[in-house]
Design a protein with these regions (language model features):
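An N-terminal assembly and electron-transfer interface module characteristic of large anaerobic redox
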Residues: 1-247
Length: 247
């Protein structure tokens, strides 16, 4: 039987002068937006999760998918309901077979079925970001900025970020890390692990509520997770190897 093959073409880097929508990821989003703006992109944040957005995403699934998938899909579909102009959406992928590494391909299939040809997915391969990123150093600072803010007490974060540039430099990050490390802490130390979306947007406010009660929530650092991923996939013959060693 003849089987039609539908190629899935996913761009690795965004085009300039076309809106680029980033997933809502708490403190990380503003710094990732600043990074992409420095690279000539036009970044915006996707809508935050609501019941309506989740319903949009779940209407396109036939199984009990983990929450990040219908949340991402629903936020993209919600944005497309408001604006059908040419736009780009950042959905990273991975080389492995795990479900969250395949979101971009499935979302692309849904958009194609809905005739959303003006919606382009930007899907960089996480394992090869040190080779593909337009500015590795700036990208890592964007990730680290979010990690450092989340390491600070919740009531100190606004003051810390107000002292930074849109994308903080190394000196600003070092200073903030030293100051946060010297702060006296109170409450229990609670480790929180999970996907970046689950630790920022999809926790139903549980982590923020714990912090409001005086507990110290230690979120798994995104920069550290990606650094280990890059280190595991390191090619010593690539120029990016020296940058990873420096990090």
């Amino acid at each position: 039987e003849q089987v039609d093959i539908h190629p899935c073409r996913l761009a690795q880097t965004p085009s300039p002068n076309v809106p680029l929508y980033l997933p809502a990821m708490g403190a990380y989003t503003a710094y990732l937006a600043a990074y992409f703006k420095q690279q000539g992109a036009d970044p915006y944040e996707l809508p935050h999760l609501t019941d309506d957005i989740l319903s949009l995403g779940r209407a396109e699934t036939s199984a009990k998918e983990y929450l990040p998938f219908p949340a991402l899909l629903g936020s993209i579909l919600a944005e497309r309901k408001n604006d059908h102009a040419h736009a780009q959406f950042l959905i990273p992928q991975t080389q492995g077979a795990e479900a969250d590494g395949q979101y971009a391909r499935v979302i692309r299939a849904v958009l194609d079925r809905r005739k959303e040809q003006n919606a382009q997915l930007i899907s960089p391969m996480l394992e090869t970001l040190p080779e593909m990123a337009q500015n590795c150093d700036a990208l890592f600072r964007a990730l680290l900025a979010g990690d450092i803010l989340y390491a600070a007490p919740a009531d100190k974060r606004a003051d810390i970020s107000a002292q930074w540039d849109a994308l903080p430099g190394w000196e600003q990050l070092h200073t903030a890390a030293r100051e946060i490390g010297a702060l006296l802490t109170k409450g229990r130390r609670i480790a929180a692990v999970g996907t970046p979306l689950c630790l920022t947007e999809l926790d139903s406010g549980v982590l923020a509520a714990l912090e409001a009660e005086g507990e110290q929530v230690l979120r798994a650092p995104l920069s550290e997770a990606l650094w280990f991923l890059w280190k595991d996939n390191l090619d010593e013959n690539k120029p990016s190897a020296g940058w990873l060693d420096q990090m």
